[in-house]
């Protein structure tokens, strides 16, 4: 039980709870971008992104089963080039960024006919205040054609997924000289097209280490806002897929959820709300309440399976003549995932969305832990408790809430640097969350409470 000095009581009338946002203060997590974040966004360059995409395409194929020792063609050549570039970026970090090759042998598996070495290229920018808190961003550098087992034909993979790797590498370049408070990890993973093998290994390695991964973003197919007919219906929109009910939910957790609700309050759904709140100008993040596209997947699922909050960025409308296709012209239509179909200004905008989200997360306090609603007695008020964070610049907490039918937080109230608060609102009628705030006004994602045991 927290001491009395760590408690607060907040009275909110029923009328205020149902009133417009202005009645209780805005609930958005975002603040005006800092000068440092604005500088970061300005440094992201479409021409550098284009150079990365074209270089990756130049390796002919990056199929997971292609050559690993040919110096100019195949996944090994791509791996070595990405590693060398990441090392070059790290040279500007003053030792804060390290680069590694995370290799493992994938045994015979679906789409892996023989034991195969798979390698992730990982650059880690160590946090300056809470380095144990980790945020991950990935793109996959392997590619494929129509036959997922064909490791010989050219598989340029410009959109899927040189575009995502370009986002990751450009972020690593721009942020290498910065000092984020938490650790940011930039990873080009392999084996995605064969079964998410690279990200699966990476996520399991974090789980085995007990790593505190508080968010992960997969950038997969982020190359253009063009539609299949060549128009640009949404060239300033990027989709963000976020699950509701956690993939890792246990049977016991499901039983509780069915009793108290919260299908839209899992950690990944809160991450989606956060990204929307801090999106930079010039790009609309369209949050989709689904784990991924219909019956499909990407590397974020590997992290969701381990209980880590994760989401997937992807372009607004995929062109299936360019995706998973042999390069050819058929009935006057050009098939294949070619660099000429990428919009490098668009990819740069996606990179800026990622940068705003990652930097805002890393500079804010961590997501509150141990958030519960006191259920020891029947009352029309609600008592919330949580663990006080240890960040040196932690200023306090905010309680947020919304109607049960609302998609996003509607109201917020600052409650101070306490670990318990009683609010004159019924837990029956609204959904609550708690988020941390630092001295500069950076807010964490909200954490939804569980019933106390």
Report the location of each language-model feature.
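N-terminal secretory signal peptides and thylakoid transit peptides that target proteins
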Residues: 1-17
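Beta-strand-rich modules
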Residues: 424-442
